[in-house]
Amino acid sequence: MCIRDRVGTDLQAILTFADKDGEPIIAKVGLSLVSVDNARKNLAEEVKDFNFDAVCAAARNDWEQALSSITVEGGGTDDLKNFYTAIYHAMVVPNVVSDVNGEYRRHNMQIGQLPKGKMQYSTFSLWDTFRAWNPLMTLIDTALVNNMVNSYLDIYDASGELPIWPLSAAETGTMIGYHSVSVIADAYLKGIRGCLLYTSPSPRDGATS
């Protein structure tokens, strides 16, 4: 089944299935900010042999590994639940907005191409995160920090400003401040420098203009 493009207001869709009572309906969904073709590629690459139970098991394993990045000792069961629930919440964002072929939508609406192994991120609530969440990431996930800083710089290159509160491929302008500057500086001072900032003074100029 393929749903063609529809343009309008107050659009609705009704889907019917020839399922039996109690029979599960499984939907495979691919997403892309670039194109429908890329959405199909993402789906084909990320979920090659679709089996719902296998996907659930793989997701559980991924979360086990992610949450194991920090080991704590002491405290009771409730303390551990609170701690690891907080770590889980800390790993929900940012979101990867690049596709499996490295293409992504830039903030000037053009299509960018990332080097192999790099990812473009969005959903940076910097007003909320610069005090604690971003410093935490410099301790537990330096690869993510490098990709995030590169994402900030790409946003600057495409739009002329470092991000404030970007979502998908656009700046929402929500909240005040220019907190991406302090996040970049924190990463640099901690020796996390696997990004493009240090060949260009432009973000510094943007912060002082």
Question: Which role does the model predict for each range below?
Answer:
Residues 1-5, 198-203:
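Conserved small/polar residues in nucleotide/adenosyl-binding loops
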Residues 4-121, 154:
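Beta-sandwich/jelly-roll carbohydrate-recognition scaffolds of carbohydrate-active enzymes
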Residues 40, 96-103, 135-138, 146-149, ...:
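Short, solvent-exposed loop/turn and secondary-structure capping segments
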Residues 70-74, 122, 134-138, 170-171:
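Second-shell loop/turn segments in exported
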Residues 78-79, 119-128, 173-180:
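Secondary-structure capping and boundary motifs in well-ordered enzyme cores
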Residues 85-98, 122-145, 185-191:
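Alpha-helical support elements that line or immediately flank enzyme active sites
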Residues 104-108, 112-114, 144-190:
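Helix-terminus loop motifs that line ligand-binding clefts
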Residues 207-208:
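Ala/Thr-enriched low-complexity intrinsically disordered regions
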